[in-house]
Amino acid sequence: MNMTLNKRWCLTAILALSAVVYTSSSFAATDRLVIESGDSAQSRQQASMEKEQWNDTRSLRQKVNKRAEKEWDKTDVAFDAQDNCQKSANVNAYWEPNTLRCLDRRTGRAINP
């Protein structure tokens, strides 16, 4: 029994040693360090295409921004006009919400309060 236990320990030690030798021999020699900056031809081409697409959509973005700014200006002017119409001393002036104008009650014409 004691003999078989020694054989098992010996066999286990030999297997462990051979596994260490086998794995150490399978590693590649790493005496060089290669550092890539990520600046490859493919990444430059992709960046160029993204820049081109951004430039192509620039005029569209500017149009959308101008339209939004015009709508905001129109709303702002209408709000000020409504406020002025309601504060007017002219009792015949009233605010027409559909046309966003200050009108005279008697004539229906636009007035400047």
UniProtKB/Swiss-Prot annotation:
Protein's UniProt name: UPF0482 protein KPK_2871
Lineage of origin: Bacteria, Pseudomonadati, Pseudomonadota, Gammaproteobacteria, Enterobacterales
Region span, Disordered: 38-61
InterPro entries in the record: DUF1283 (IPR009700)
Similarity section: Belongs to the UPF0482 family.
HAMAP family, per the entry: UPF0482
UniProt keyword Signal, yes or no: yes
Pfam families according to UniProt: DUF1283
Residue ranges, compositional bias (Polar residues): 39-48
Leader sequence segment: 1-28
NCBIfam families: PRK13659.1
Domain of life of the organism encoding this protein: Bacteria
Organism name: Klebsiella pneumoniae (strain 342)
Biased composition (Basic and acidic residues): 49-59
Keywords (A to Z) from UniProt: Signal
